[in-house]
From Swiss-Prot:
Entry similarity comment: Belongs to the RecX family.
Stored Gene3D superfamilies: Winged helix-like DNA-binding domain superfamily/Winged helix DNA-binding domain (1.10.10.10)
Its biological purpose: Modulates RecA activity.
Entry protein name: Regulatory protein RecX
Keyword set, alphabetical order: Cytoplasm
Entry keyword annotation includes Cytoplasm: yes
Places the protein is found: Cytoplasm
Superkingdom field: Bacteria
Alphabetized PANTHER family for the sequence: REGULATORY PROTEIN RECX FAMILY PROTEIN
Originating species: Salmonella paratyphi A (strain AKU_12601)
Amino acid sequence: MSEPTSRRPAYARLLDRAVRILAVRDHSEQELRRKLSAPVMGKNGPEEIDATADDYERVIAWFHEHHYLDDERFVMRFIASRSRKGYGPARIRQELNQKGISRESTEKAMRECEIDWSEMAREQAVRKYGEPLPSNFSEKVKVQRFLLYRGYLMDDIQQIWRNFAD
């Protein structure tokens, strides 16, 4: 018979919890640390794992060693995922920063991803406002505001009207 979770060592419970977390999607190291240290809902309400800092470090090291936790892979997949959803480089950088990814790692991955951000900005504008894109000033401002919110840079937005003039 399996022993109750309260009697299992904290390290084993942390390892199980980390496996469940990483089975859903890739996470950054900082995200995994945050989720592991947060209380988990049990049958009788929130339960905390009484683990030591060493237990957390051992779990993180185990996942790095077995290549289940890799910030570089996470960043590349995150950029691909968010860009497919129509978000621009500024927003993606901000989200990666919130997930604890260093600026250097983010910039390296952004250079390697080879995404044409001005073309993506145009696709988003056409999807939202239709073809041809508006040419009067007030409508252009609406398009710019929408694309800035989505995380595109002003240079990429201005390229839409320079490169793709109707």
